[in-house]
């Protein structure tokens, strides 16, 4: 047995499923998950000593690559001053100033510890601000594991074949309306059915938890218009897309102005950080200035703030997002070319530093049903054969891939060459 197999066997006796987040268990592809010893640049190194070109990037945060010296040094320097204070720090102010400067729609920002905390808190704030209870989310989108959001959830719940998670009371779920991503008619129908009851829409601007599905040109502006028409707030969940699709996020890339924005992943530089923010009048409703309660023992943790501040300063450097886009486009085009040579039907969606691989005869993948019609079994074989080639993709047909600026042209070419060999075996 490999060391990963031994560790996984031991882990399953101690940790549910052997992992601390379900998708890591390889449930969506089968087999034994890799146990990682270290990472550097574009590469992961497992406990058995094998190196992999990494397109998971810790599920999104590692836009600069692993073990970036600026982030590492910032963490070391901050740790020397103490690990946690439970009191305000100067770095929290600097971080808030940086985030609100980079994302102009955020007049104010509140730091939390995860993307789930960010979305959960933003929805509570929207409900408190509007005095309404119902929310709209979209089938196949994932916004964390809060009860009100695990209703026809995407991501791991798709892989597990559970459109609704057990443990979510029906009384919670009844306030969550699930519409069809990229279908404005379904959203209008929800508003017309409950014109005075919907507090907010929460949406991934690029659906990254049913692989990678970009919005149709009219979709996000249409959501903005519907929120304005019916007096609801628009929450854009940029936990995945923030600072990756564009410096100011997918909202800037697609030209839509939300009332609230949720951030995570890149904002922490690899540390556990989330944030939510937006219009000043809405944020003023948050405790302690307003009646909507939210708190966190480790929110604004000095180590996490130092990591995030260093990361965002690097991400804001000129050329970063152009490089991300160029590398991702090169990979997508190379995979399509290699698949065509092998007569393998393939669609590759990509936006900025995100991409999605779909085995399908369809010309495009735009809707939830398009994703669900893809050949998951072929993806499983593709995943394992690529892993043997030293390429680590997301271990699920329903998760996006992530590029970093640490990936080189050689890494991209080696990945395409590996895919060419794998396609010949499928």
UniProtKB/Swiss-Prot annotation:
GO cellular component: cytoplasm
Molecular function (Gene Ontology), one example: transaminase activity
Pfam family, one: Aminotran_3
Record EC number: 5.4.3.8
Pathway per the UniProt entry: Porphyrin-containing compound metabolism; protoporphyrin-IX biosynthesis; 5-aminolevulinate from L-glutamyl-tRNA(Glu): step 2/2
GO biological process, one term: protoporphyrinogen IX biosynthetic process
Keyword Acetylation assigned: no
Recorded family membership: Belongs to the class-III pyridoxal-phosphate-dependent aminotransferase family. HemL subfamily.
The protein's name in its UniProt record: Glutamate-1-semialdehyde 2,1-aminomutase
Species whose genome carries this gene: Salmonella paratyphi B (strain ATCC BAA-1250 / SPB7)
Lineage: Bacteria, Pseudomonadati, Pseudomonadota, Gammaproteobacteria, Enterobacterales
Gene designation: hemL
């Amino acid at each position: 047995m490999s060391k990963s197999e031994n560790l996984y066997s031991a882990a399953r006796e101690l940790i549910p499923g052997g992992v601390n987040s379900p998708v890591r268990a390889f449930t969506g592809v089968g087999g034994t998950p890799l146990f990682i010893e270290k990472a550097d640049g574009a590469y992961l190194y497992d406990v058995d000593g094998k190196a992999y070109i990494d397109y998971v990037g810790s599920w999104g945060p590692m836009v600069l690559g692993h073990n970036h010296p600026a982030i590492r040094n910032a963490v070391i320097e901050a740790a020397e001053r103490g690990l946690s204070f439970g009191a305000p720090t100067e770095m929290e102010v600097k971080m808030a100033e940086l985030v609100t400067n980079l994302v102009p729609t955020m007049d104010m920002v509140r730091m939390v510890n995860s993307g789930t905390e960010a979305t959960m808190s933003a929805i509570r704030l929207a409900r408190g601000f509007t005095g309404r209870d119902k929310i709209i989310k979209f089938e196949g989108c994932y916004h964390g594991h809060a009860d009100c959001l695990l209703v026809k959830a995407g991501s791991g719940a798709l892989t597990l074949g559970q459109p609704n998670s057990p443990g979510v009371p029906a009384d919670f779920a009844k306030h969550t309306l699930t519409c069809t991503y990229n279908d404005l008619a379904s959203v209008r129908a929800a508003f017309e059915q409950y014109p005075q009851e919907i507090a907010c829409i929460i949406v991934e601007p690029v659906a990254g938890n049913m692989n990678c599905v970009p919005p149709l040109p009219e979709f996000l502006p249409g959501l903005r218009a519907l929120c304005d028409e019916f007096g609801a707030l628009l929450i854009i969940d940029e936990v995945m897309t923030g600072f990756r699709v564009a410096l100011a996020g997918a909202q800037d890339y697609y030209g839509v102005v939300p009332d609230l924005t949720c951030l995570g992943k890149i904002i922490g530089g690899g540390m556990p950080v989330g944030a939510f923010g937006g219009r000043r009048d809405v944020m003023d409703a948050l405790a302690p200035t307003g009646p909507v309660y939210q708190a966190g023992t480790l929110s604004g943790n000095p180590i996490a703030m130092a990591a995030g501040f260093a990361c965002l300063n690097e991400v804001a450097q000129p050329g970063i997002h152009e490089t991300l886009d160029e590398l991702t486009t090169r990979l997508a085009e190379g995979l399509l070319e290699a698949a065509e040579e092998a007569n393998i039907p393939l669609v590759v969606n990509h936006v900025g530093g995100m991409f999605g691989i779909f085995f399908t005869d369809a010309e495009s993948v735009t809707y939830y049903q398009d994703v669900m019609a893809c050949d998951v079994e072929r993806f499983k074989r593709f995943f394992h054969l690529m892993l043997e080639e030293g390429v680590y993709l997301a271990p699920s047909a329903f998760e996006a891939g992530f590029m970093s600026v640490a990936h080189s042209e050689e890494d991209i070419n080696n990945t395409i060459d590996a895919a060419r060999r794998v396609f010949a075996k499928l």
